[in-house]
Amino acid sequence: MKVTFKDVTMSYDGKKDTLKDLNFTIPDGTLVSLLGPSGGGKTTTLNLISGLLAPTAGQIFFGDTDVTKKDALARKVGMVFQNYSLYPHLSVLDNIAFPLKMAKVGKAERHAKAKDLAKLVHVEDQLDKKTGALSGGQQQRVAIARALAKSPSLLLLDEPLSNLDARLRIEMREEIRRIQRETGVTTIFVTHDQDEALHISDNIMVLANGSIQQFSSPQTLYDQPNNLFVAKFIGEPVINTIPAQALSADLANAVPEAILKQAVTAGIRSEAIIPYDAGENVLAKFHGKITHSSKYGREATADIDYNGERLLSTEMAGVSSRQPELDFYITKSGFFLFDQSGALIFGGESHAE
């Protein structure tokens, strides 16, 4: 099911807009993550999609149908919350089958459907157990199966991995991706964890301060951020940011003068600072002093002093710790310039111009 927002605004108190003029389309059959800091509008957006909230203004469409005034029951979406909300007195089988029981589906039919879903989420060997006897990952699988019981056109997941340990989070994000692909259901996944979003999503919507900062594929977010917020929010380690003026002399032959005059902040990915000449991929060269270096396994990093600014490079393999000063090169990929408003004015696709 395709989901479309047209000029959607949401205000809880009638004074301050939690969401302002949201316009987007989520294609049918895709997995989209809503990513951003706390208070950015992720859960509010999800609740508007589900029908738990009604927008202050604007329209919401499922396919070509206007569902703006339809409640959650009428929209027929499946939801999985952070706490799973399973029924502890019921077996796994009856938890999965519960929505079908409420819909007056016969026992044999609902149990057959529940068993099929249990196989899909890999809990078919746990059907007779109470949910309290399950691990966190198993409980989440049951919650997803229950959400799929009525064959929803949309599956909504609100921070579903936050209660799991690091190993289980990795395992379960891959399972969610597998389940989504096998069912083909349009899935919307809310998270504040960029690693989850980058690994699981077809597309990511970055939300902050109630507005969409960028809505694109994970790779595009990283390679072509719309603005400084996205550049800093996406990527690990966090992108190096320094005043553009500190680089102006070394960029004079690589960046048009008109752009340099507008540039306020330079963003440089740590892998875009290299200690060797990469030929045509090089944008600029500078001389820097290594103030600290670290090597662990295949990872070699260095803190570099450049005109009084600190830069981190993660491409220092093969560089001797006895070389405190040397020439560094900035690659075209991973370098960006932003203006006073934070908008991207150079970098990403602009290198091809």
Predicted regions and their residues:
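Helix-to-loop junction immediately C-terminal to a conserved catalytic motif
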Residues: 50
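Non-catalytic connector elements of ABC transporters
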Residues: 237, 249-353
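The feature captures the beta-strand-to-loop junction immediately N-terminal to the Walker
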Residues: 35-37
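ABC ATPase nucleotide-binding domain helices that frame the ATP-binding cleft
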Residues: 43-46, 142
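A short, flexible loop at the N-terminus of ABC-type nucleotide-binding domains that lies
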Residues: 1-5, 9-21, 69-71, 104
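Conserved ABC transporter NBD signature motif
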Residues: 58-66
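ABC ATPase nucleotide-binding domains
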Residues: 72-78, 82, 86-227
